Design a protein with these regions (language model features):
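Edge beta-strands of extracellular beta-sandwich domains
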Residues: 161-165, 277-283
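Intrinsically disordered, low-complexity acidic Ser/Thr-rich regulatory segments
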Residues: 2-9, 13-109, 121, 147-220
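Forkhead-associated
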Residues: 87-150, 156, 204-274
C-alpha cells in the first residue's frame, strides 16, 4: 500500500502532532488556557491573561557562587599544619576579615598574625586587601619592578628586610680635638637592613654605587642556607632620586609590605603571618 505525507502523522485540517507541545517548551505557558506565550509578551494572545512579572524577567542563574564573574577566592598555598595546604575561602560577602581570631578567614594557630590582621573587601568590582593595623603587616608578591621608599619592608625567601637611609656623617673630634680612628666611610645612597625575630637589626649592607643584590650566593648579601631563596633573588636599586625593588625571576617571589590597602588581581600572592595565599578571580 502506498502512503502520502498527509496520511502519516498528519491530517489535512490540523497541525502536525507535537507542534503545540514544542511551542510550549520554547515559551511561557499560560496558566489559564495552556497556550504558549512568546518571550517578551505581557499578555496571553489566546485568552488575554497577564503574564507574571517574574516570567518576563527570568534570568539564568549560575550553578554556584564560584561561577559568578568578579568573585574571588583565596587558596592556602603554604600554611600551618592545623589549616593545611589547598584550603580555599570563597569571598562572596562584602568584607572578609583574616586573623588569629577572625570569623571569616581564621588562622588560630599562627602566632605571627594579629587577632584581626587584614580585610579582603570589594570596592565596586575590584578586590582589595587592607591592613587592619597588624603588627607584622600584609605582604604582596611583586611583578617585576615596583617603586619603594625609605622605611619599606620586603621579604625574600625566609628573610625580612628594611630599606634605610644612610646615616649622616656625624664624626668629629673629641673635646680635646682628637679624632677617633676608624675605617674610612664609603659614600652610599641607601642601605638594606635584615630584620630579625623580635624586631632586632641583623645584617646591614650599604649600597655599593646604586644597588644592593640579595640572594643565596655571589651577591652583596648572601644567605647560603635559605633553601627558599634563589641564587640571585632580588635587588634594590636607585635611579635618580627614586628607589625600586626588582625581582630577579626568583622561584618563590619577592614580597613587599603594603601601606594601608592594595588592589588585588587574579594570580596575586599574599603573605599573612606564616600563611601564603593565592588570589583567584572568576573572569
Amino acid at each position: 500500500m502506498a502512503y502520502n505525507c498527509r496520511e502519516v502523522g498528519r491530517s489535512e485540517s490540523g497541525p502536525r502532532r507535537g507542534t503545540r507541545g514544542m511551542e510550549q517548551a520554547r515559551n511561557y505557558v499560560c496558566t489559564e488556557c495552556a497556550s504558549a506565550v512568546p518571550s517578551g509578551h505581557k499578555f496571553c494572545g489566546a485568552c488575554g491573561a497577564n503574564v507574571p512579572a517574574e516570567a518576563q524577567t527570568l534570568a539564568t542563574r549560575f550553578f554556584g557562587a564560584l561561577q559568578m564573574p568578579g568573585k574571588a577566592r583565596l587558596i592556602v598555598v603554604r600554611g600551618d599544619e592545623a589549616m593545611g595546604e589547598g584550603l580555599s575561602y570563597l569571598l562572596q560577602a562584602t568584607e572578609h576579615v583574616a586573623g588569629r581570631e577572625a570569623d571569616q578567614i581564621p588562622f588560630p594557630s599562627d602566632n605571627w598574625l594579629s587577632p584581626s590582621h587584614a580585610n579582603f573587601l570589594y570596592r565596586g568590582e575590584k578586590l582589595v586587601v587592607r591592613d587592619e593595623g597588624s603588627l607584622n603587616g600584609v605582604y604582596i608578591r611583586i611583578r617585576g619592578t615596583v617603586p619603594i621608599q625609605i622605611g619599606d619592608h620586603f621579604m625574600c625567601g625566609q628573610q625580612l628586610f628594611r630599606v634605610d637611609a644612610t646615616p649622616k656623617d656625624t664624626s668629629g673630634p673629641e673635646a680635646d680635638q682628637t679624632y677617633f680612628y676608624a675605617s674610612p666611610r664609603r659614600p652610599s645612597a641607601f642601605r638594606i637592613t635584615q630584620v630579625l625575630e623580635g624586631g632586632m637589626d641583623g645584617i646591614v649592607c650599604c649600597a655599593r654605587e646604586q644597588s644592593v643584590q640579595i640572594g643565596r650566593e655571589d651577591c652583596d648579601i648572601n644567605f647560603p642556607d635559605d633553601v627558599y631563596m634563589s641564587p640571585r633573588h632580588a635587588r634594590v636599586e636607585m635611579s635618580g632620586e627614586s628607589l625600586a625593588l626588582v625581582d630577579e625571576n626568583s622561584q618563590n617571589g619577592t614580597y613587599v609590605r603594603i601601606r594601608g590597602e592594595r588592589e588585588l588581581s587574579h594570580g596575586d600572592y599574599v603573605f599573612l603571618g606564616r600563611n601564603l595565599l593565592r588570589v583567584e578571580v572568576t573572569a
